[in-house]
Amino acid sequence: SLDELNVLDVQGIKEKLMSAQNMAKIIVNAVSYADLKVFCAALVLAMKEGKHYMARTAAAFTKVMGRISDQPLLGREQLEGDTKNGGIVLIGSHVKKTTDQLNCLKKLDGQADFMEFQVNTVFEENGLEKEVERTVKAAEEKILSGRTVVIYTSRQLLAPENMTPEEKLHISVKISNAVTSIIGKLSVKPKFIIAKGGITSSDVGTKALRVKKARVMGQVKKGIPVWMTGEESKFPGMPYIIFPGNVGEVSTLKEIVEELI
């Protein structure tokens, strides 16, 4: 609990950790790095006595456990890819903050090329497949010419009348898979990829780029990590920027793209 962390009850927390069995779930109510340091001290003591744990955490946990010092935000120098091709930004999130960030990003029209992925093609026979093919072809031409491409899904929500929640979910998954496949079908290596949205960025990394192992380079902005893709991935040695949907200010996406193009 937060009280145990605040009074620095390392021994008491360690005893709780030692008593956990059969994949018991342990929830840590830490609200600061100071709280996390207390918990990690107890965790290390428990691990030294032979206990093993599987952690599902945010980045703060690995920072404290690894005793990683604060690092400056990454800049253009560290994010330069090994190609003169343009980059690609893929925006799948529909939350209001993402839409506001997209509208702000459009101020770079002329410096980047914007392409809207028509999600309503999901209702046409082979519509999504054709839309993916169209988008990939156009994007590759721009990337090869050194231009950065911004691909975003139509902002309207598709919710036809009389459609069940299960049917809506099925459509949502089909669209999400189609959007992710754009990266998977690219035959040219972009100098960077930015994926916007929690599900979008996860699927692009694991499914489209087939990343099994990556080096975490740091953050380009607060809460926005950057991977350097591994040798086994579709595009080895490329900066991959993971931008969750509800993170950043209205201008954050524009600032990142502006620095990279």
Stretches found by the model and what they are:
Residues 23-27, 52-54, 86-88, 146-150, ...:
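Residue-level preference for the first positions of well-ordered beta-strands
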Residues 1-36, 261:
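Cap/lid and interdomain-hinge subdomains that line or gate substrate/regulatory clefts
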Residues 1-2, 26-30, 53-58, 63, ...:
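General beta-strand structural signal in soluble alpha/beta enzymes
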Residues 57-84, 218-240:
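Short, flexible loop segments at boundaries between secondary-structure elements
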Residues 24-28, 32-36, 40-50, 56:
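Active-site pocket-lining segments that scaffold enzyme catalytic pockets across diverse folds
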Residues 189-190, 195-198, 202-250, 255:
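Active-site histidine-anchored catalytic micro-motif
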Residues 45-48, 62-63, 134-141, 149, ...:
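Catalytic cores of soluble, metal-dependent hydrolases
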Residues 78-87, 91-177:
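A glycine- and small/hydrophobic-rich beta-loop-beta segment
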